[in-house]
């Protein structure tokens, strides 16, 4: 059985766009760079050729990864999400119980997480601690930097 990869429509669209770019723009550019480097003669000491081949290997590896991710994607329509319990797609407002610092996070797929933008991976310690909880609940997050306690203030959708 193939594991589905949950993600938002926005995250899925970004993966599709990167895949299109790598296949239709980056791949031809690298092939051209390899051909140009080959034209310079001796390949054994041709740094341009080796750099282009390395770029090709990296690009093709990422293309394979993106094809796999998009094939296994489970796109979750956040406009149809609701309820008081926290699950994938929820935007959660928390207060750090030690510092009273307020944080707002949206729970998203692994590929679209960006902590600076307030998007955390569903598999992160804090998201795992929040799943199934509601506003008013307290959670304890055990992370590599130590343990932190938060109170959930609000759960929003969309």
From Swiss-Prot:
DNA-binding is among the record's keywords: yes
Function, as annotated: Necessary for efficient RNA polymerase transcription elongation past template-encoded arresting sites. The arresting sites in DNA have the property of trapping a certain fraction of elongating RNA polymerases that pass through, resulting in locked ternary complexes. Cleavage of the nascent transcript by cleavage factors such as GreA or GreB allows the resumption of elongation from the new 3'terminus. GreA releases sequences of 2 to 3 nucleotides.
Keywords: DNA-binding, Transcription, Transcription regulation
Alphabetized SUPFAM superfamilies for the sequence: FKBP-like, GreA transcript cleavage protein, N-terminal domain
Gene name linked to the record: greA
Family that this chain belongs to: Belongs to the GreA/GreB family.
BP-aspect Gene Ontology terms: DNA-templated transcription elongation; regulation of DNA-templated transcription elongation
Source taxonomy: Bacteria, Pseudomonadati, Pseudomonadota, Alphaproteobacteria, Hyphomicrobiales
Molecular function terms, GO-annotated: DNA binding; RNA polymerase binding
Any matching Pfam family: GreA_GreB
Cysteine disulfide partners in this protein: none
PANTHER family referenced in this protein's UniProt entry, alphabetically: TRANSCRIPTION ELONGATION FACTOR GREA
Protein name (record): Transcription elongation factor GreA
UniProt keyword Coiled coil, yes or no: no
Signal peptide feature range: none
């Amino acid at each position: 059985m193939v594991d589905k990869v949950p993600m938002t429509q926005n995250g899925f669209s970004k993966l599709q766009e990167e895949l299109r770019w790598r296949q239709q723009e980056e791949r031809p550019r690298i092939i051209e760079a390899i051909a140009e480097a080959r034209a310079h003669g001796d390949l054994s000491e041709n740094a341009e050729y080796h750099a282009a081949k390395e770029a090709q290997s990296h690009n093709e590896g990422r293309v394979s990864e993106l094809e796999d991710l998009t094939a296994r994607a489970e796109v979750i329509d956040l406009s149809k999400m609701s309820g008081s319990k926290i699950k994938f797609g929820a935007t959660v407002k928390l207060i750090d119980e030690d510092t009273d610092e307020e944080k707002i996070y949206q729970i998203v797929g692994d590929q679209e997480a960006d902590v600076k933008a307030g998007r955390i991976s569903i598999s992160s310690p804090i998201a795992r601690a929040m799943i199934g909880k509601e506003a008013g609940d307290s959670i304890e997050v055990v992370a590599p930097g130590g343990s932190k306690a938060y109170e959930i203030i609000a759960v929003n959708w969309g």
